[in-house]
């Protein structure tokens, strides 16, 4: 049941991502593989069994050094230039799960898909923590704007 719920939420998040004409990406930093971006329009809170989680969509745009290595791993990845990943963080951001990875080509067509697992792992890198912090800040900003729009003048 938990897997089905998470799968449905991932699909929902991906639908929102596909529907957006222009993504609202913010660069978080660089890795040895490329540049990591957060999609500020695809952040969703989730409550399951009384626990709060945060779904976040991020993109890794591969650099020129990593692309040939990536593309040689599998025939399906020959044209891949970036990967869109959906993460699920626990309430305090100390644990995360990688739920889905979608490898896309230069035309944003999915060329390869990898399902993750809802198993939570400890956050171990600065960029993983920064991804959670930026997502939380964006969620707070969205709430603040929604509250402002609700006010009657």
Give short role names for the model-derived ranges.
Residues 1-7:
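Bacterial N-terminal signal peptides that target proteins for export
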Residues 15-18:
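N-terminal signal peptide c-region/cleavage motif recognized by signal peptidases
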Residues 20-84, 89-153:
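N-terminal secretory-pathway/extracellular module detecting exported/lumenal segments
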């Amino acid at each position: 049941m938990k897997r089905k719920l998470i799968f449905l939420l991932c699909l929902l998040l991906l639908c929102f991502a596909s529907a957006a004409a222009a993504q609202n990406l913010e660069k978080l930093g660089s890795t040895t593989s490329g540049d990591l971006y957060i999609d500020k329009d695809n952040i969703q809170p989730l409550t399951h069994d009384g626990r709060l989680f945060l779904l976040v969509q991020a993109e890794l745009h591969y650099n020129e050094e990593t692309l040939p290595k990536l593309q040689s791993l599998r025939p399906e990845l020959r044209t891949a230039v970036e990967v869109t990943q959906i993460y699920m963080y626990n309430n305090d951001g100390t644990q995360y799960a990688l739920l889905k990875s979608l490898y896309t080509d230069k035309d944003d067509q999915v060329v390869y898909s990898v399902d993750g697992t809802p198993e939570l792992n400890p956050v171990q890198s600065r960029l993983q923590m920064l991804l959670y912090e930026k997502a939380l800040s964006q969620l707070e900003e969205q709430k603040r704007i929604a509250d402002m729009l609700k006010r009657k003048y």
